[in-house]
């Protein structure tokens, strides 16, 4: 539903694939929870407002022609998470906003390819790195300004919490868990602990360690890697250099690309040393997390 003067723009750009987005989420998450969905141009003060069955979009964005499909994908995802499944407490807002942000990124991967998805995730990482909330945890129970919770922690970092979780448990368990979470709490409310429990069940292992660090610790891992090569052994020393008040992070499966050889490391604690056998030549290049599964910053030192 648009004002007559804005209909041409709406049909050619932001809403061109609106029906495809709806079908994609239905296949991915479970049945659309309502009988219909309308996209409505309105005078809302928000860029998009995810009212159940009737999403409102700011009329000014039509006039400026900067609404964009990512906003439509984000607000449509809220029909599942935010509307049908709602966080029980405002401090768990990431259960709405982080989910919608990541689902919009998944739509981008589906529609536009993996390179577009990776670029979007890198952009979100930069937003987290540069945000003023970086020193606060996602579950900030001290927050009293509820509107202030509409920040990068609950949107972009929340999306990264889901992306990292997917990397930890694998696609099968991750998407199975998402569908189970939706079907279990549809037309109801949930807390982060509910989601953590269902994902642990889907993965078949305890994920409390992950949700504890992802949701209750501020910041992100900052890694300094130093390496030495001798014979056929590569020794890698990893230091976590983030501020002490952020705590230490566990990264159970950190991939290093040593030239063209993927090496899997386990990072746990402020200092980690691992010796990798079978590296015959002195590396020319070492890349940390080449597939972009972790929200982190890393530096790699030269051979000692």
Regions inferred by a protein language model and the residue ranges of each:
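Hydrophobic alpha-helical and helix-loop surface patches within well-folded domains
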Residues: 1-244
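Beta-strand-rich binding/interaction modules
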Residues: 207-208, 221-223, 227-290
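Short acidic/polar inter-strand loop motif in beta-rich domains
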Residues: 263, 290-303
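Short, gly/Ser/Thr-rich active-site loops of penicillin-recognizing serine hydrolases
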Residues: 283, 303-304
């Amino acid at each position: 539903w648009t004002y007559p003067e804005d209909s041409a723009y709406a049909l050619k750009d932001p809403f061109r694939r609106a029906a495809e987005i709806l079908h994609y989420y239905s296949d991915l998450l479970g049945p659309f929870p309502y009988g219909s969905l309308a996209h409505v141009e309105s005078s809302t003060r928000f860029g998009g407002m995810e009212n159940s069955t009737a999403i409102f979009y700011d009329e000014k964005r039509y006039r400026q022609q900067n609404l964009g499909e990512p906003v439509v994908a984000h607000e449509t995802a809220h029909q599942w998470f935010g509307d049908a499944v709602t966080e029980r407490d405002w401090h768990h807002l990431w259960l709405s906003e982080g989910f919608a942000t990541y689902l919009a990124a998944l739509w981008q991967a589906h529609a536009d390819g993996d390179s577009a998805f990776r670029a979007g995730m890198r952009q979100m990482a930069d937003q987290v790195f540069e945000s003023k909330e970086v020193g606060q945890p996602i579950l900030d129970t001290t927050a009293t300004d509820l509107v202030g919770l509409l920040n990068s922690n609950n949107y972009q970092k929340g999306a990264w919490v889901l992306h990292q979780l997917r990397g930890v448990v694998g696609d099968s368990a991750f998407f199975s868990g998402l569908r189970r979470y939706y079907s279990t709490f549809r037309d109801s409310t949930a807390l982060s602990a509910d989601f953590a429990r269902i994902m642990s069940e889907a993965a078949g292992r305890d994920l409390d360690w992950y949700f504890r660090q992802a949701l209750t610790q501020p910041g992100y891992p900052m890694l300094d890697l130093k390496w030495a090569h001798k014979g056929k052994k590569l020794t890698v020393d990893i230091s976590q250099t983030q501020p002490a008040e952020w705590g230490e992070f566990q990264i159970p499966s950190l991939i290093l690309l040593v030239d063209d050889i993927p090496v899997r490391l386990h990072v746990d604690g402020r200092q980690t040393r691992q010796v990798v056998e079978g590296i015959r030549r002195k590396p020319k290049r070492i890349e940390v997390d080449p597939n972009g599964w972790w929200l982190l910053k890393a530096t790699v030192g030269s051979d000692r």
